Regions:
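Gly/Pro/Ser/Thr-rich low-complexity, intrinsically disordered segments predominantly at protein N-termini
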Residues: 1-162
Length: 162
């Protein structure tokens, strides 16, 4: 069974599979409250004045990175994926990702995810913990701790309210 078949099978079983630098991470599917936070944040994504990025977002889709397979809660791209790629695991690297922390998976989202994403070419990583209202904004050489609600301007000239 190849990785794409394993991913599809894991969805049928109600779990998410992610691979980070060779380490397989299994996670339960997100719950209602989690998804409401994701939808609220996604609805706030917009283009900053003077930006040329289309600020296209995708929710909960698999992305094949050079060193792993992740399924960010929100991925932000400057353009739509190509037509051929829209029916399979995406391979284009997002400009930014947003993760909403699920209870019990704090380490995955706060400690494992940000350095992995940055190492794969993602420019901005936002992690929101709804329990504490912490918003962690990580980019190359910088990590900021903010408190929700907050407007964050991304390097790609998009903005998002977390």
């Amino acid at each position: 069974m190849d990785l794409q078949q394993l991913v599809l099978r894991s969805d049928e079983l109600g779990v998410r599979l992610e691979v980070v630098n060779g380490l397989a991470i299994w996670e339960a599917q997100p719950l209602y409250r989690h998804q409401k936070h994701v939808e609220r944040i996604a609805a706030s994504i917009g283009r900053l004045e003077g930006g040329n990025c289309d600020c296209v977002h995708a929710l909960d889709v698999y992305i094949q990175f050079p060193n792993g397979l992740k399924r960010p809660d929100i991925s932000i791209f400057c353009r739509e994926p190509g037509e051929a790629e829209q029916d399979s695991v995406l391979t284009m690297v997002p400009e930014a990702v947003v993760e909403v922390v699920s209870k019990g998976y704090e380490a995955k989202d706060l400690e494992i995810g940000p350095p992995f994403y940055l190492s794969q070419g993602v420019k901005d990583v936002l992690v929101f913990d709804p329990q504490t209202l912490l918003v962690l904004h990580v980019c190359q050489g910088q990590a900021r701790r903010l408190v929700s609600p907050v407007v964050v301007d991304l390097k790609c000239r998009c903005s998002v309210v977390v």
